[in-house]
Amino acid sequence: MANYYEVLGVQASASPEDIKKAYRKLALRWHPDKNPDNKEEAEKKFKLVSEAYEVLSDSKKRSLYDRAGCDSWRAGGGASTPYHSPFDTGYTFRNPEDIFREFFGGLDPFSFEFWDSPFNSDRGGRGHGLRGAFSAGFGEFPAFMEAFSSFNMLGCSGGSHTTFSSTSFGGSSSGSSGFKSVMSSTEMINGHKVTTKRIVENGQERVEVEEDGQLKSVTVNGKEQLKWMDSK
């Protein structure tokens, strides 16, 4: 039986945050919907990753697992009350999909609903959870995460009207991640309508800024590609 720490790729001394980050990364990688050409293997790995997270993310279950090991845990089981050992009765793991959606704030991160949720997280816990999950899940895009944070700041600023929209396309028939995100922010600055659009696809970030419908600047991975000088 696989070692749950090895399944998540973490040390036995891993912190709860390390466990969460590992789960985000592996669950997104092996979700069956992201692996249509390798669904059977993906389902097995996704289930195992879910099992590992379910045990190691719970301090009591993790402590018992550390003492008994994976084989004993699976053979024994979970407690019906907090006063019994989880090895008293047969343990049934939760549905991997339920854990996955719960982890991402009750939403499917591959759906439009996830991306259309409010991003002004400072006013509510749910948005903050999405931002945290998103940050760790796509930590390989630092420029994108910086952009994501700036969107939160815009949403909480006063004296401007800001709207957000975003789209995600999951799945890939090739070896690439197939991840694409489009986020746009519109606000009024000194009487001018300024729209900032950020597009992240295949590890590259493109930022377009329009003022009153006119394209003003374009940057790719932080490097300026186009800039219109105001002739006024």
UniProtKB/Swiss-Prot annotation:
Effect on the protein upon substituting K216A: Significant loss of activity
List GO terms (cellular component aspect): cytoplasm; cytosol; nucleus
Q: Which cysteine residues pair off into disulfide bonds?
A: none
**Record has Ribonucleoprotein as a keyword:** no
Annotated source species: Homo sapiens
Protein name, as recorded: DnaJ homolog subfamily B member 8
What gene name does this entry carry?
DNAJB8
InterPro entries on file: DnaJ_domain, DnaJ_domain_CS, DNJB2/6-like, J_dom_sf
Please indicate which superkingdom the organism of origin belongs to.
Answer: Eukaryota
CDD domains, from UniProt? DnaJ (cd06257)
Q: How does it assemble?
A: Interacts with histone deacetylases HDAC4, HDAC6, and SIRT2, HDAC activity is required for antiaggregation.
Mind listing the GO molecular function terms for this protein? Hsp70 protein binding; protein folding chaperone; protein-folding chaperone binding; unfolded protein binding
Q: What does the function comment of this entry state? A: Efficient suppressor of aggregation and toxicity of disease-associated polyglutamine proteins.
| UniProt keywords, alphabetically | Chaperone
